[in-house]
Amino acid sequence: MYKITATIEKEGGTPTNWTRYSKSKLTKSECEKMLSGKKEAGVSREQKVKLINFNCEKLQSSRIALYSN
């Protein structure tokens, strides 16, 4: 289990702290792609996000039990 933390910056928005738990290790670019808005029909651009202070750490087995319940 991995704990992923970062600060999300979106155009026109205030920075937001973000945490996600994942069974697999994710890269910064994978997380940015996941969080960016999807393109819709009739919309000329998608909303991109930028992650700062990105960190992906493997949790110790004793800490995993706390988050899997």
UniProtKB/Swiss-Prot annotation:
Phenotype of null mutants: Mutants show increased numbers of double-strand breaks. The single ralR and double ralR-ralA mutant have increased sensitivity to the antibiotic fosfomycin.
GO biological process, alphabetically ordered: DNA metabolic process; response to antibiotic
Domain of life where this protein originates: Bacteria
Coiled-coil spans in chain: none
UniProtKB keywords: Antibiotic resistance
Function, as annotated: Helps to maintain the integrity of the chromosome by lowering the steady-state level of double strand breaks. This region of DNA acts as an antitoxin to toxin RalR, a DNase, but it seems to be sRNA RalA that has the antitoxin activity and not this putative protein. Therefore the identity of this as a protein-coding gene has been cast into doubt.
Identification of the protein by name: Double-strand break reduction protein
Lineage, highest ranks first: Bacteria, Pseudomonadati, Pseudomonadota, Gammaproteobacteria, Enterobacterales
Gene: rcbA
